[in-house]
Amino acid sequence: MKVAILFLSILVLAVASESIEESRDDFAVEELGRATCAGQDQTCKVTCDCCGERGECVCGGPCICRQGNFLIAWYKLASCKK
């Protein structure tokens, strides 16, 4: 009986974890839409003017705006070539 309860508990945790992960992915897509400067029709500058005070340019690509201490991006940022 204890083994069955333990197994069911692990199963419930696995399902809950998957649900949380899906919600996190949806949140990242929405945040990326708000965080990038694509809608402002401005090119990314070194100072990232299009993002205001919360932005930085990444690898010469789009301007990604900071949200707290994190860079919100749908894709993992590639390392910059020097």
Swiss-Prot record:
Residues 1-17 form the signal peptide. Disulfide bonds join 37-51, 44-57, 48-80, 50-65, 59-63. The keyword Secreted applies. Residues 18-34 form a propeptide. Transmembrane segments: none annotated. GO terms for cellular component: extracellular region. GO terms for molecular function: sodium channel regulator activity; toxin activity. Expressed by the venom gland. It is found in: Secreted. Keywords: Disulfide bond, Ion channel impairing toxin, Knottin, Neurotoxin, Secreted, Signal, Toxin, Voltage-gated sodium channel impairing toxin. Coiled coil: none annotated. Reversible inhibitor of voltage-gated sodium channels (Nav). Delays the fast inactivation kinetics of neuronal-type sodium channels. In vivo, it induces rat penile erection. This effect may be due to the neuronal nitric oxide synthase (NOS1), since one of its selective inhibitor completely abolishes all the toxic effects of the toxin. This toxin also causes scratching, lacrimation, hypersalivation, sweating and agitation followed by spastic paralysis of the anterior and posterior extremities and death at dose levels of 0.24 mg/mouse. The presence of a 'disulfide through disulfide knot' structurally defines this protein as a knottin. Belongs to the neurotoxin 03 (Tx2) family. 06 subfamily. This is Delta-ctenitoxin-Pn2c. It comes from Phoneutria nigriventer.
